[in-house]
């Protein structure tokens, strides 16, 4: 009996050893691939974070200086633990972490500043894995498809990485290859997040982050389908074809699949790289203006919005043929399609914000689900204080003091913010994320909250609302009347913009004259 047991143990050991060698040789022996490891890590991190909040703030008077200080420390510790979890579990976790890191004025700064780093911390697939995906999806080896293929990726993201390659006909292309394990893990990861969010809500009733899970559940399958990304790229290129400053790389459909996307290779600097713009004599204000026009057109006029404009996805360059500044828009996996009702309400809301119509602000905020929290909603949309909203967001640029106040208030109003995010239409969530990403770019460029950006938004709102009215108009006379009203409103905006420029020019001349007088003054004495 003992001999049989020994023999069985020997054969079992051989089988396990052989399995281990096989798994190792095929690069599958990765703890992150085992569901139990990923689940255990996520559960443990959630438990530690929850325990920290429960115990660290228990004995401190709410709202006191000590409470605020301790809460900030807990936020920072928790953000770092969440960051480590995202880096360890990768894939979907990094994607969700990046989303949270983009919500600059909606979440405490400790979280956004910590998680923002995930945009540059995405894992890379090995060349063996890249070859495997290309072989499985395109049915050929890399050397059969490309004259050359750079092993080092141009960039890696949470779901994929991009390599530079040259086709046999000499064309230079960018090859986007999905990480091989993301597809299989994504649905399980989202289910795990859903369970954890529900569990945490039992401990903290004010913790309402199911909206984040719902968004991931809806959007991740679309982002993992690169054919969908290619269709989005072609749609937005056609939709914004009248903007000569926009470049969307062409898709090569013959070598594209759900996990591999081949596109035209376009070089440029990141949109937040001021040094690159200065070196290439690209006007920062012009780029900021173009970016604002492009997104206003997407949101207010077309209702088809690129929702991931972080700096790595928006490049700038000088056009080779004309030398004019050009924006290159990349990564078209995540778009938000706005319903007409939402788009028109959002147009009315921004018109109310721009022209300080407080009754309209309340009415359209409530139509969009803000209820009595409409002042907070206005602050979230504009990233301005309620005092600035009441005075007019175009009247004065945001100050460092106001910006700091808003960021601090995000921590104080976290329960109300999460409640609001659970009640607004789902379409609003990605719009808020997009707003914050664009605002971050403008802050880096030093062009935030310029009057011209609000005027461009207002132009698009007027056009969108007029187009809707003309479609519903029953007669030619009524359509003509609407067209005249639209033209008059646009003329008023143009006149207002002209007056602002004249005022700025006069101020510049006055300052120049004053500086000239000051430099000459010592010689007179």
Curated annotation (Swiss-Prot):
Gene Ontology cellular component annotations, sorted alphabetically: mitochondrion
**What positions constitute the catalytic site?**
308 (proton acceptor)
* Localization of this protein: Mitochondrion
User: For binding ATP, which residues are annotated in this chain's numbering?
Assistant: 154-162, 176
User: Which keywords label this protein?
Assistant: ATP-binding, Kinase, Mitochondrion, Nucleotide-binding, Serine/threonine-protein kinase, Transferase, Transit peptide
The enzyme's first-digit EC class, named in words, is: transferase
User: One GO molecular function term?
Assistant: ATP binding
Its Gene Ontology biological processes?
A: negative regulation of mitochondrial fusion; positive regulation of cristae formation
Q: What domain of life?
A: Eukaryota
InterPro entries named in the record: ABC1_dom, ADCK1_dom, Kinase-like_dom_sf, Mito_struct-func_regulator, Prot_kinase_dom
User: Which family does the record assign?
Assistant: Belongs to the protein kinase superfamily. ADCK protein kinase family.
Q: Please report the name of this protein according to its UniProt entry.
A: AarF domain-containing protein kinase 1
Question: What gene name is given for the protein in this entry?
Answer: Adck1
